[in-house]
UniProtKB/Swiss-Prot annotation:
Protein name (record): Protease HtpX homolog
One Gene Ontology term from the biological process aspect of the record: proteolysis
Enzyme type, top EC level: hydrolase
Keyword Membrane annotated: yes
Protein residues bound to Zn(2+): 144, 148, 227
HAMAP family in alphabetical order: Pept_M48_protease_HtpX
Chief localisation class: membrane
Entry annotation: catalytic residues: 145
Protein family according to the UniProt entry: Belongs to the peptidase M48B family.
Annotated compartments: Cell membrane
Length: 299
């Protein structure tokens, strides 16, 4: 089961990378066509941006994400012995290297894992989760995060985060160029465009508008699916579903975070902003907490 899940996540990583390139290519073509009168130029800029952003995220993802979420790193066990040893124990049970450990100064209880692979992983917890949870509950939470590390979920989420951020940046770049350029392409089309050109223009604009939404939906779907798997993985590591159940109940009954970055919301064990759930759940970063707890109770 475990090795099948790791292999599946590695395949999903390739699929997400392919989607990343395809979406960026499409948005690049659209931005180039609408704003610069050259779809090919837009495509080249998008591909260059994709390569740069992927290299940056893969090589620097941990530091970037931790900086965005105001995490401070523990460098040795003496910095926080209890947290350090819980992470160390769970890493040993999960058979993964000891990850880097960070603390986020925030009263709301929450935690997340990030990185590129088990050899370059990091775990962050808030001061709020340390204050409210017992050791048994903390083991359940850290076991959940170690499952993300062990199953290569962290790589999948790093790529999804890059996908969402890069497309948003490309759209913003195109819109800024449009406004500063005075909408030159639109005026040219108004003067000498035919019906087909107008249709292409409308289609390109629709693509530009919907691309960030599509990227966000992919990221959210990935996040929802991985939370169920990590919950089950935590129980496998700790042999104690009650610890995680109690932890999730306390996390759910808390105030929103202040230090969390919106683009990292999907990484956390629970939605850090306590956003109202949509009835379709398409726009939710996490599955309903009640469903997660019910599944754990049925194990």
């Amino acid at each position: 089961m475990l090795f099948e899940q790791i292999a599946r996540n590695k395949r999903h990583t390739l699929y997400v990378m392919a989607a990343f390139v395809i979406l960026l290519a499409v948005i690049g073509l659209a931005v180039g066509y609408v704003f610069f009168n050259s779809a090919i130029a837009g495509l080249l800029v998008a591909l260059i941006a994709a390569v740069f952003y992927m290299v940056l995220m893969i090589s620097q993802s941990t530091d970037i994400v931790m900086s965005m979420n105001h995490g401070r790193e523990l460098h040795q066990a003496d910095d926080d012995p209890e947290l350090w040893h819980i992470v160390e124990d769970m890493a040993l049970v999960a058979k993964v290297p000891m990850p880097r450990v960070f603390i986020i100064d925030d009263e709301s209880p929450n935690a997340f894992a990030t990185g590129n692979d088990p050899e370059h992983a990091a775990v962050a917890v808030t001061t709020g989760i340390q204050a409210r949870l017992t050791r048994e509950e903390m083991e359940g939470v850290i076991g959940h995060e170690m499952s993300h590390v062990r199953n290569y979920d962290i790589r999948l989420q790093t790529i999804a985060l890059a996908l969402t951020a890069a497309i948003s940046l490309l759209v913003n770049w195109g819109m800024n160029a449009f406004w500063w350029g005075g909408g030159r392409r639109s005026r040219d089309n108004d003067r000498d465009g035919n019906g087909a050109q107008v249709l292409l223009m409308i289609l390109a604009i629709v693509v530009i508008i919907l691309a960030p939404l599509a990227a966000s939906l992919v990221q959210m779907a990935l996040s929802r699916n991985r939370e169920y798997l990590a919950d089950a993985g935590s129980v496998e590591l700790t042999r104690n579903p009650l610890g995680l159940i109690s932890a999730l109940e306390k996390i759910d009954d808390s105030q929103p975070m202040q230090a969390a970055d919106p683009s990292s919301a999907a990484l956390y064990i629970s939605d850090p902003f306590k956003a109202k759930k949509s009835w379709t759940h398409l726009f939710d970063t996490h599955p309903p907490m009640a469903d997660r707890i019910t599944r754990l109770k049925n194990m």
